[in-house]
């Protein structure tokens, strides 16, 4: 028989950055902190299959948000309202120490046959990062699955007082001109119209 326990320690973002650099951070470590508006959030440290470290929101922000004010996925991630919201409004809510340590991450999507790249400090995850390789992955050629999402139950997130909830991904639905992918409340993927508001769970990388 065994008992499994966990420990909680105070730390700083600079210490976490050093842990990423020297390899002492552990897959699945959870970092809890407050946004400048007082909201408490947690991010989980995880690697992709190439060994790159990411920090991913454990649950959604309290407020839901649409991908675009209009029901369109034209321009995909690069052109969507959500991208501007995360990299302006939400980024400004992060602690100053964390802001200074976040590295711009290159996001690559194939949109209408063309390679489109953006540099983002905060970003939604792609369908490939959450669900692994599939028919959609040719449109996300640089992405691999994050290790924190290998099990279906690990893709479930809560949103404010809603309990388990739907949360957006940055991947546009190829068969539709109006939809992006999202994760439903029991951890599988579908897509819906971009103007609907669902949960927001961003990721970032450190310098």
Where is each model-derived feature located?
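Collagenous Gly-X-Y triple-helix signature in extracellular proteins
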Residues: 1-207
């Amino acid at each position: 028989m065994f008992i499994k326990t966990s420990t909680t320690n105070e730390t700083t973002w600079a210490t976490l950055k050093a842990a990423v650099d020297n390899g002492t951070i552990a897959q699945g470590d959870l970092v809890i902190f407050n946004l400048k508006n007082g909201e408490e959030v947690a991010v989980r440290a995880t690697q992709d299959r190439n060994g790159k470290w990411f920090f991913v929101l454990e649950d959604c922000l309290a407020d839901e948000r649409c991908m675009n004010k209009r029901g369109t996925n034209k321009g995909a991630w690069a052109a969507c309202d959500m991208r501007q919201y995360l990299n302006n409004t939400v980024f400004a809510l992060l602690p100053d120490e964390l802001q200074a340590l976040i590295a711009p991450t290159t996001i690559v999507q194939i949109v209408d046959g063309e390679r489109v790249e953006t540099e983002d400090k905060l970003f939604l995850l792609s369908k490939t990062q959450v669900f692994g390789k599939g028919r959609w992955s040719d449109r996300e050629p640089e992405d691999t699955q994050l290790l924190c999402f290998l099990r279906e139950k690990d893709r479930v997130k809560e949103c404010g007082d809603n309990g388990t909830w739907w949360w957006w991904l940055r991947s546009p639905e190829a068969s539709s001109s109006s939809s992006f992918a999202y994760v439903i409340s029991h951890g599988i993927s579908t897509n819906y119209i971009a103007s609907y508001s669902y949960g927001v769970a961003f990721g970032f990388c450190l310098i």
